[in-house]
Amino acid sequence: MSSEQQNEADSKPAVIPQCFKIENQYETFSRLSETSTPGVVPSVSTLWRLLFELQKMIECEPSCVEYFRQRKEELESHVDSEIETSKDESSVNKVEEKVEEFKEDNVEQEIKQKRSLSESPQESMLEKVSKKPKVSEAHNEEISPENVETIENELDLPVKGKDEQTTGLVYKNANDLLTGSLLSFIVDDSFSYEQKKKLLCVDSFPTSDVRSLVAGTPATDDFSHNKPNNQISISTFYSSLDPYFRAFNDDDIAFLKKGFDVSSSYNIPPLGERYYDLTPEDEMTNLCANSIYQNLQTSAQGSLEAFNEADTVSEEVRCGPLTERLMASLIPCYTQNDEEQKPSIAVGEFAETDSGSEKSKIGTSIDGIESGNNEYTEQPDIQESSLSICEDRLRYTLKQLGILYDGDVDWSKRQDDEISATLRSLNARLKVVSDENEKMRNALLQMLPEEMAFQEFQNVMDDLDKQIEQAYVKRNRSLKVKKKRIVTDKIGSSATSGSFPVIKSLMDKRSMWLEKLQPLFQDKLTQHLGSPTSIFNDLSDHTTSNYSTSV
């Protein structure tokens, strides 16, 4: 090697492998090994992270040895080139001494230093976490199930009884920890894909979170030893599912053909007597018998001339039901919101202007009504001031205006109260639901005969399959018995030939059954279990529109 090549080799920087940056890993390891509270056992997640960092530091040792081996070869080649070019024997001896010194001192010293760095974090972890005497050469020996409990007590690993109150975890014992069954609890997004595969000892790892695909929450209790007292038997479970998976029969067709008359549900019963909250039954009976509401008078009585203030609390002088309702509709109804919204002008001015405007409106409307009525027919004689005549005149006027239809109203059977209005609204909704049920019943009635035919086809197929299976079992059983005995070939052939025609006839019957009837149910045989869409989709859309219209 020339002097220029030698200078170039000396000036070339040495490539330090990535594993030599062990100080960063040591800092990470120290940060993980520190516990918040002294004397508290860290969680299993922290322990596994510590072991993972230790494994990465220990793996640095082979790469360090490889690095020094390469440097040694470079130095030896450099020394050999110096020996060839140098003519001075003393310089050769100096170079050889330099190589020997580097071999003995520098290389071994560096390797020992790196080994001590990789071993010191492990000792510090055991001192901080376990705080118990170190088990000699426990990491080199195989851990058997017999000494798992001993190691658990010596290392003070977290178990269910200790971590259940502190960390909320449900780890069982040290065996689960050592076998790696708890690794799935510590893998998070901070690990790379290769680290996850290496940590879990698998060839592949799911790239997305698949916990949403798990059927429910996994059970964390131990059911291997103690059986729950309230566990439901399997027979009870099957019997509860039987009504949903049973076969159809003729009773189902008869049930669908039988209609349900719900017309009586739309009739609103007449109003009954008033309720009196009286405890003695005799007093209630007497009071109801003498009550004025038992035979309620709906006709107008009395006249305006004989009307005084004392008649307001009795039924001797009263207006007709139409007049009472019309007057009740003209009375203003004040609510709490109306009281809060006070007018900005004075109350007296507001009352005067309001009353004046109302009087003017009422006067003009009455004049218009009277003038309009004179155009059609003559009004009845109203010289008498009887309330019944006022009732008839009011009814006549409302009919002329088109507000009141022709026909007499039976006021004793009125149904315009709040309860009757609610009943009519519910009856309208009930009618919509009844129409929907009727359409669904007709749809099921049309599909049920085809389903029962396919059900019969499957039953016959299952029966033929069972007969063929029983024939084969019987044939094989007879052959096993014949093999145990010493028989001639003639006897064996006769035994097999006797069962063959039975099996052949069953197979022919099955093939003929499939050939004749399978094309009729090809769609049902090829489709998956269950229908992809509901058979009531069209009905539900139509019913929803009708329901919204009625409401």
From Swiss-Prot:
Comp. bias regions, Polar residues: 371-383
An example Gene Ontology molecular-function term: transcription coactivator activity
InterPro entries linked: Histone_AcTrfase_su3
One Pfam family this sequence matches: Ada3
Segments of this protein annotated with the region Disordered: 106-144, 351-383
Compartment(s): Nucleus
Record flagged with keyword Isomerase: no
GO cellular component, one term: SAGA complex
Signal peptide: none
Stretches of the chain forming a coiled coil according to its record: 417-476
GO biological process terms on file: regulation of transcription by RNA polymerase II; transcription initiation-coupled chromatin remodeling
Residues that bear Phosphoserine: 120, 144
Keyword Hydrolase: no
UniProt keyword list: Chromatin regulator, Coiled coil, Nucleus, Phosphoprotein, Transcription, Transcription regulation
Biased composition (Basic and acidic residues): 106-117, 125-142
Self-association and partners: Component of the 1.8 MDa SAGA (Spt-Ada-Gcn5 acetyltransferase) complex, which is composed of 19 subunits tra1, spt7, taf5, ngg1/ada3, sgf73, spt20, spt8, taf12, taf6, hfi1/ada1, ubp8, gcn5, ada2, spt3, sgf29, taf10, taf9, sgf11 and sus1.
Its job: Component of the transcription coactivator SAGA complex. SAGA acts as a general cofactor required for essentially all RNA polymerase II transcription. At the promoters, SAGA is required for transcription pre-initiation complex (PIC) recruitment. It influences RNA polymerase II transcriptional activity through different activities such as TBP interaction (via core/TAF module) and promoter selectivity, interaction with transcription activators (via Tra1/SPT module), and chromatin modification through histone acetylation (via HAT module) and deubiquitination (via DUB module).
Entry similarity comment: Belongs to the NGG1 family.
Listed name of the protein: SAGA complex subunit Ngg1
UniProt organism field: Schizosaccharomyces pombe (strain 972 / ATCC 24843) (Fission yeast)
